[in-house]
């Protein structure tokens, strides 16, 4: 989820997202602001104001190759330059002293092609976003009770070929999309922090 606090493309405030998440039955949310991870003190304040919701912070990194990779790791208030090369991102991540989880977000949002740059990314991330509000925008069809991207096959083929963990995300930038699409995970207890979530 993106907030107006850190992502210029969002019109949703952090507190409003938290309120809506609880109203819509979510147990947890992950803020994935563009290029920056929430500062620990600010995230702590938001968590304190919303004890009924588990709040995590990752970062969505826009790459020079034209794709976006989300990083979930121990909160270290990360900041990455816009259009960093994927190889440089991996180098930066190698300096982290803790595990991290990466996934490519909406890789086929504009086309179904798989150029060599995308193949390289797919071969080195842990997961792939198969559906989100922004993937569906202007290119969806309904199959039974689900809305799917028109190019669902491209997403599923990449996920299967590379053995990637499938993710279904709101990718919320506005109130209406909070919880519209969500991951359902069968955990006995929610991870206490980003480090456990990444594992």
Regions found by a protein language model. Give the residues of each.
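Mid-domain alpha/beta scaffold segments of enzyme catalytic cores
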Residues: 15-16, 20-23, 27, 35-65
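A short helix->loop->beta-strand "cap" motif at the edges of active sites that frequently abuts
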Residues: 26, 53, 98, 161-164
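Internal, conserved structured core segments that host functional sites
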Residues: 94-107, 115-122
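Mobile, glycine- and charge-enriched loop segments
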Residues: 1-10, 52-54, 72, 93-99
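Charged catalytic cores and adjacent phosphate/nucleic-acid-binding surfaces used
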Residues: 2, 7, 19, 41-44, ...
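Binuclear metal-dependent hydrolase catalytic cores centered on His/Asp/Glu-rich metal-binding motifs
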Residues: 69-101
């Amino acid at each position: 989820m993106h907030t107006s606090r850190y992502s210029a493309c969002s019109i949703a405030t952090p507190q409003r997202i938290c309120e809506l998440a609880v109203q819509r039955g979510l147990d947890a949310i992950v803020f994935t602001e563009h290029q920056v991870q929430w500062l620990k003190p600010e995230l702590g304040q938001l968590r304190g104001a919303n004890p009924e919701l588990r709040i995590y912070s990752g970062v969505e990194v826009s790459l020079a190759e034209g794709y976006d990779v989300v990083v979930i790791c121990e909160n270290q208030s990360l900041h990455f330059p816009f259009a960093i090369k994927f190889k440089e991102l991996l180098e930066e991540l190698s300096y982290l002293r803790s595990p991290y989880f990466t996934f490519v977000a909406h890789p086929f949002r504009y086309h179904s092609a798989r150029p060599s740059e995308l193949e390289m990314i797919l071969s080195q991330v842990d997961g792939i976003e198969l559906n989100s509000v922004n993937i569906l925008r202007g290119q969806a069809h309904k199959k039974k009770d689900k809305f799917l991207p028109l190019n669902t096959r491209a997403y599923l083929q990449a996920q299967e070929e590379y053995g990637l963990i499938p993710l279904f995300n709101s990718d919320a930038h506005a109130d209406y999309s909070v919880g519209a699409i969500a991951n359902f995970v069968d955990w006995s207890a929610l991870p206490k922090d980003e480090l456990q979530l990444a594992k």
